[in-house]
Regions:
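An alpha-helical, amphipathic repeat domain used for nucleic-acid recognition
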Residues: 1-217
């Protein structure tokens, strides 16, 4: 069975190269080195080597996922796709093959356990962001959440606390009104209906907003 003949630090902090029988075998993080008491002279079985390599890859994927999440909140689907792409590139395999890796589920489970990944919190964040900064209607926001893999029950529960679409639609249209000042009522109606529909507002909300604009003219 292979024997550890050398343990050398890498240029990267807290990483070490493990040499078996005089040849480089694999790299490990410091925590894995310490946890498994790896030292020169130690004999490793094939199963132990495989476990150490998997543990190291899992740790690296977890670090990459945490960096990915540090830029902004993500849905579970977004993180799963990201991890799949990383595995596909690392192992030089197709995306659909990488999707089957058990490492993805293991990383996602760890992220959820420590509350780094929560689709309910992600949905709340995205809804508030889209309403405040982009003035989008609920149907467009709902579509975006579905695309990001958020469960429909979560989507409905989050959207149900944002019932007043009229105020949001009025805010969205205000930016356009100066440009449309000289339009006839019919042309204004076409512009308002088309714009608000493209922002994801429903027909009744658009109708109410247009009536408000005409009354204010």
């Amino acid at each position: 069975m292979p024997r550890i003949t050398s343990v050398k630090p890498q240029k990267r902090k807290e990483r070490f190269n493990i040499f078996l029988d005089g040849k480089f075998a694999f790299g490990v993080d410091e925590n894995i080195l310490v946890k498994n008491h790896l030292k020169v002279g130690q004999i490793l079985t094939g199963d132990q080597i495989e476990k150490l390599i998997k543990e190291t890859i899992l740790g690296k994927l977890l670090d990459q996922a945490l960096r990915f999440l540090s830029y902004r909140p993500r849905s579970q689907k977004e993180v799963t796709i990201y991890l799949t792409q990383k595995i596909a590139k690392r192992e030089n395999i197709k995306f659909r093959e990488a999707k089957e890796s058990p490492l993805i589920g293991a990383v996602v489970a760890k992220l959820k356990r420590y509350n780094y990944l929560d689709d309910h919190e992600f949905a709340k964040w995205l809804v508030n962001l889209r309403i405040k900064s982009a003035s989008r209607g609920l149907s467009l926001i709902k579509w975006e959440l579905i695309q990001k893999g958020v469960d429909r029950d979560i989507i409905e529960s989050i959207l149900s606390i944002h019932p007043n679409q009229t105020l949001i639609a009025k805010k969205a249209i205000e930016k356009k009104l100066k440009r449309w000042q000289g339009l006839s009522e019919l042309d204004l109606k076409k512009k308002v209906y088309a714009y608000l529909a493209s922002r994801g507002f429903d027909f009744e909300t658009i109708k109410e907003v247009f009536a408000f604009l005409i009354k204010r003219r």
